[in-house]
């Protein structure tokens, strides 16, 4: 037996939340032909088109560092929190809709002069990345 999976589509509000923009922005993109919609009512955005647009948006973020690196997972964002406790520090970076948390030495946090509002690049190099999907 062949298994045919229905194409994933998203409501405008879901697409907006996933892209970190307002519903109105998604509607404008639809009106401008940037995002297609399926023939359903209310309008739904095909998942593959939404994914392609998410990649375009992500590549628009300027990486302020002038470094070459083997790490490919780079999150440009703003430091939102620095909590120093003894010899360790927790630094939170908000990169679009993504919150990246780093644990580092308090000395490193001070040397980097990290504080809320600082521009930073969270660089992730991992040997394991777990992918999850919602159950249907």
What positions do the PLM features span?
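Short boundary/loop segments of OB/S1/cold-shock single-stranded nucleic-acid-binding domains
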Residues: 52-71
């Amino acid at each position: 037996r062949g298994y045919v999976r229905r194409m994933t589509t998203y409501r405008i509000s879901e697409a907006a939340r996933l892209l970190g923009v307002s519903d109105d922005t998604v509607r404008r993109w639809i009106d401008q032909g940037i995002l297609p919609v399926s023939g359903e009512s209310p309008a739904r955005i095909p998942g593959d088109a939404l994914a392609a647009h998410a990649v375009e948006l992500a590549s628009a973020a300027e990486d302020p560092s002038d470094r070459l690196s083997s790490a490919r997972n780079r999150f440009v964002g703003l430091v939102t929190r620095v909590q120093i406790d003894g010899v360790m520090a927790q630094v939170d970076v908000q990169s679009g809709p993504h919150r990246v948390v780093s644990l580092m030495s308090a000395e490193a946090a001070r040397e980097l002069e990290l504080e809320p509002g600082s521009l930073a690049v969270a660089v992730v190099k991992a040997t394991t990345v777990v992918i999850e999907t919602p159950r249907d």
